[in-house]
Amino acid sequence: GDQIHLGAKVFMFTEYKILAPVVLVLVIACGFSPLGWYTAMAIAVGALSSAIAGFIGMYSATQANVRTATAAENSGAESALSISFFGGSIMGLCVASMGLVGLGGLYFYFTGAMDDPDKIAKALEGFGVGASAVALFSRVGGGIYTKSADVGADLVGKIEAGIPED
């Protein structure tokens, strides 16, 4: 379990190191566009919120994996299902919480900085752009990471252990 957790953590840090310059270019390009710096700030906050939610979700899921396997072995399927359900619900609650805190904080800030409700709404749209950019990269990168781990496990099973193809 520790190896899975460590591998997932290394993947997340590597992914975010690659993603940070992409988000930075997006923020700077938006800042110099007619959309303005308020929208650029919302993009940055949305990207940060999504990245934090993704990291917390990955951390909790890898921790829940070990606990679920242990519970299945020692206590049976009911206990394992309960642990896996609550371990997975952390991600959903974290995404909703980060969205509410991020959008709420931006709305509070923008209503004090701007008078026009249309400009506030346009600026808040940047939050979704930033969050979606990180989610897209995480989805695609995570799929590639998962497939490469699957292929590696298949090769080890066939070559090292002599396990036939399933």
Across the structure, where does each feature detected by a protein language model lie?
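Hydrophobic, small-residue-rich transmembrane alpha-helices and their short perimembrane loops
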Residues: 1-166
